[in-house]
């Protein structure tokens, strides 16, 4: 009789566990989907794209359309950095023609996206109107000569850019920067990863990126101290980054 009672209790316990697991998974999946939609990246860069997010036991599927290849990568990196996500199946499609790698249209997209990641430049007011044979022409407004010069520096360091003509005017700032703005960690991580990939000086780095409460930790390898210091400098200027812990080793 005692043995039978134990068996019944064990069966009941297993049944309760089986019932509770889907409920827990469902809540986690709902949280993943909600966090992705409310993230800085989705509300800022991807707000005009048609992206559907579905999470099943932490396996996330992204479907729909985006306007640029960079948006597809940003969506993947953001979702992959969310707590509870095990993997991302990125089936997003890019609308329209895909510019060939290192073409002028491709460089134009990369320069514009890279400038948007950095808070010390006026990415929203910077117009990348013309790219010809790798030479980028910048127009729009900067809030100071120093900001204009930094915009030139960042654009020159984008992989594939051969030169920059900066025709931006200098005007008094009318919009606030993102300094001190609280941006979710997944969005910070995604921006940092994309920024490091797009900059020529850091594109070859073997770097892992994690973010906790705005503090970014870099790990991996750098060729020398200069390369390591540059990575820290660039990451420090990304939207939402509060500080950087650079744990990269030098080869």
Describe each model-derived feature in a short phrase.
Residues 2-251:
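N-terminal targeting leaders
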């Amino acid at each position: 009789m005692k043995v039978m009672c134990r068996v019944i209790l064990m069966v009941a316990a297993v049944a309760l566990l089986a019932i509770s697991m889907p409920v827990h998974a469902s809540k986690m999946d709902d949280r993943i989907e909600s966090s992705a939609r409310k993230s800085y990246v989705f509300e800022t860069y991807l707000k005009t794209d048609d992206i559907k997010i579905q999470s099943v036991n932490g396996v996330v599927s992204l479907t729909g359309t985006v306007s640029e290849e960079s948006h597809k990568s940003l969506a993947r990196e953001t979702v992959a950095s969310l707590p509870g996500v095990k993997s991302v199946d990125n089936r997003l499609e890019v609308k329209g023609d895909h510019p060939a790698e290192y073409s002028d249209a491709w460089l134009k997209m990369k320069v514009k996206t890279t400038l948007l990641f950095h808070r010390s430049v006026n990415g929203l007011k910077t117009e990348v109107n013309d790219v010809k044979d790798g030479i980028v022409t910048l127009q729009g407004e900067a809030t100071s000569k120093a900001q204009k010069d930094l915009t030139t520096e960042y654009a020159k360091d984008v992989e594939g850019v051969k030169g920059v003509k900066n025709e931006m005017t200098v005007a008094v700032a009318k919009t606030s920067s993102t300094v001190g703005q609280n941006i979710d960690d997944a969005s910070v991580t995604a921006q940092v990863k994309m920024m490091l990939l797009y900059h020529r000086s850091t594109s070859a780095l073997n770097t892992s990126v994690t973010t906790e409460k705005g503090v970014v930790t870099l790990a991996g390898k750098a060729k020398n101290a200069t390369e390591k210091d540059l990575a820290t400098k660039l990451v420090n200027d990304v939207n939402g980054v509060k500080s950087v812990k650079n744990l990269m080793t030098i080869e």
